[in-house]
Amino acid sequence: MADGNYGIVHQDSPDRRGIDVALLYRKDCFELLEADFLRLSFPEDTTIRTRDILYASGVLDSDTLHFFVCHFPSMIGGEKQSEWRRERAASTVRHKVDSLLAVQPRAGIVIMGDLNGKANTPAQKVLGTKSSDKKPRCKDLYNT
């Protein structure tokens, strides 16, 4: 990989297990424009420490793309009991997506990673994704 001209976007997250998110990219194919780590906070329970959400944008083949690299909070403590944490993560992503779409309605957005749930969970509903068999429309997110 050292010869591949790769770049990486990474920072240590507050996760106690040392799990982080990162974006690995080829510098000769993708021009990184911006990177930010969205910190998830849980004032209701300050003992919760989870992975940040990585937001990065860049240019690929003259198109600007926006990436969200996610590893939503785990189901520790039970799926239903911990769902609100994943909903908070989804809400954080959705808020940033909405702010991007307000400026650029046809923005190319990719949300990827481990969302710790199925397509029909409450957290997925917060994201507002639609089935990928629907006709694409601006400002919609699709599951694939």
Model region roles, listed by residue range:
Residues 1-64, 72:
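Structured beta-strand-rich core segments of catalytic domains in phosphoester-bond hydrolases
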Residues 86-144:
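Metal-dependent phosphoesterases centered on the DNase I-like endonuclease/exonuclease/phosphatase
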Residues 63, 68-85:
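Active-site His/acidic residue clusters
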Residues 24, 67, 114:
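A residue-level signal for conserved active-site and pocket-lining positions in enzyme catalytic cores
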